[in-house]
Amino acid sequence: MAKKVEKLVKLQIPAGKATPAPPVGPALGQAGINIMGFTKEFNARTADQAGMIIPVVITVYEDKSFDFITKTPPAAVLLKKAAGVEKGSGTPNKTKVATVTRAQVQEIAETKMPDLNAANLESAMRMIEGTARSMGFTITD
């Protein structure tokens, strides 16, 4: 018989840098998870993606065991890295802060494809372009 799910915990943690300190510790402590077990496993699984923020969905079962799924980094984080900026524009309709090429958008869309609700690469690229525009980025060919 399948284990009964008690709780889902969603977090965004820097790859390879999960620690028992807030915000990770309190979120997992409330769910009754072995915090050190999670942090060691997460850090081992994400060590190759250093510097990126990784969304993780932790499934907690009734017997306090858990498993987790790591997702691809958020599109905004990938866009900022591609453009080489710290943050997007506060007023994207007036102030443009950076430029990304369609090739960079395609690369990001290919990376994000498993997590996007897109039928093909073209629609995934349009989603990423929309995120870029809302951050005050200009898209060039």
Swiss-Prot record:
InterPro entries: Ribosomal_uL11, Ribosomal_uL11_bac-typ, Ribosomal_uL11_C, Ribosomal_uL11_C_sf, Ribosomal_uL11_CS, Ribosomal_uL11_N, Ribosomal_uL11_N_sf. One or more lysine residues are methylated. Keywords: Methylation, Ribonucleoprotein, Ribosomal protein, RNA-binding, rRNA-binding. Gene3D superfamilies: Ribosomal protein L11, C-terminal domain (1.10.10.250), Ribosomal protein L11/L12, N-terminal domain (3.30.1550.10). One of its GO terms (biological process) is translation. One of its GO terms (molecular function) is structural constituent of ribosome. It comes from the Bacteria. One of its GO terms (cellular component) is cytosolic large ribosomal subunit. Part of the ribosomal stalk of the 50S ribosomal subunit. Interacts with L10 and the large rRNA to form the base of the stalk. L10 forms an elongated spine to which L12 dimers bind in a sequential fashion forming a multimeric L10(L12)X complex. Belongs to the universal ribosomal protein uL11 family. Forms part of the ribosomal stalk which helps the ribosome interact with GTP-bound translation factors. HAMAP family: Ribosomal_uL11. This is Large ribosomal subunit protein uL11.
